[in-house]
Amino acid sequence: MNDVDILKKIEKKVLWLACWMIHNANHIRENQDGLKVGGHQASSASIVSIMTALYFSILRPEDRVAVKPHASPVFHAIQYLSGLQTKEKIENFRGFGGAQSYPSRTKDIDDVDISTGSVGLGVAMTSFISLIQDYIARKQFYKNKPLGRMIALVGDAELDEGNVYECLQEGWKHDLRNVWWIIDYNRQSLDGVVHEGLSERLSSVFSAFDWNLVVLKYGKLQEEAFKEPGGNKLKKWIDDCPNQLYSALIFEGGEVFKKRILDDICLLYTSP
């Protein structure tokens, strides 16, 4: 079994535990007032592969991570599997004294590097921490210390926040380095509509500030499917799918999604 296969097995455990944590909080655990607890299963599922790879393969001791708020169930699941979180805390997720809704350095017991919330502050903090790290290194306050990578796991809706763009400007002024922003572009937002063409607009913003931009869009199975007869039509359908249709089909489920793709691809074949 190679490393990728091992990571896939870990990923399944992390995803199951994260989803169970939310399900338990909403449907199993005693709820005296009957109010919905929430927990963001979709926002957790959309980044579980990336977080599994980071925490079980890529991160070094000197690296620091700002986890997007709506991925806290995945973070707590990873910490639990690593022996840094307790069963009691995850059973009481989003409850009094339990694992926090958003990763918190002051309220959580697991290994939170940067407290994050719903206003994008964790994103900007990675850039300023990196600038401070460079200042300390230049002044030689701590000699022979390896430089860490400051990593932000960013929900696409967090990029509505103005402080994110302020720190992009400051980073450009001061030759920012050793920073990764991994944007989970899942086309979902609780606070508004995700507009068409937003990904291209965001790409142009980062390019304007001289960031090294890498776009990961298609999975391995999709890339294999593109090589099959009609694969170019499938790729075009994915690229052209508007947000409204994408959201509706995700809600309807796999069979409806598959039928719509096949119906549309057949139309593409017969169109002049």
Residue spans of the language-model regions?
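Short internal beta-strands
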Residues: 66-68, 178-185
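Short, contiguous pre-domain boundary segments
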Residues: 1-3
